[in-house]
Amino acid sequence: LSQPVSKYDSDLISEFTEAMATGILDNYIKRTFGKASEFSESLEETQLHSLTTELSLSIYRASAGRKVGEFKKNSIEDIGDTIDFLLYDNIKLEGRFYECVSDFGSYKLLGAGKEFISYLLHIRDPSLFGMWNGSAEKSLKLLGWDTVNLKKGPWGIRYIDLLDMSYRIQSRFRLADLRSVDQFNHWVVRFSPISQINKII
């Protein structure tokens, strides 16, 4: 991993490390990742046939899904088919992401958007796949990154752009993996000094 490129970065790293030590993110981490290992095991290709509606709802809620009523309208068969396609089909990642997120996609589930789909990818492999939620975009903006490409074009290409920026945040701020990037983003948006300054402005 690269060294901090400035005192600004170094200070943010120190402040984030100190914040983690205080437990300020414990509730968020428990809510979002407390059952990540269990979820990941249930999403293994050989286990998908055992996926239940209750478990799929738990995964949806952990991803911060807010349209529970809509999501409940999906059959467990459709949910399983979408997960199987997303995680195990041979077409490129951007194609799979598009088909699961776009309103025109063949595997779009009711109530499920980029947050749920990126969460599924992430819990299967947090070293490769980042989470695309509100904090991810807001954090990038607070850190001064250009996020215009996240607002236009095919969904799959947008996710690839989000991943690229997530990898760069991981390297720049010396974070362990993309799960740490998500926690860092959450902290930046809600608790960091730059978020407080932004609120004042």
Region roles according to the model:
Residues I117-R124:
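Contiguous, well-ordered alpha-helical segments that form the cores/surfaces of helical PPI scaffolds
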Residues L1-L110, D125-I201:
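An N-terminal alpha-helical hairpin/helix-loop-helix interaction module that forms a charged
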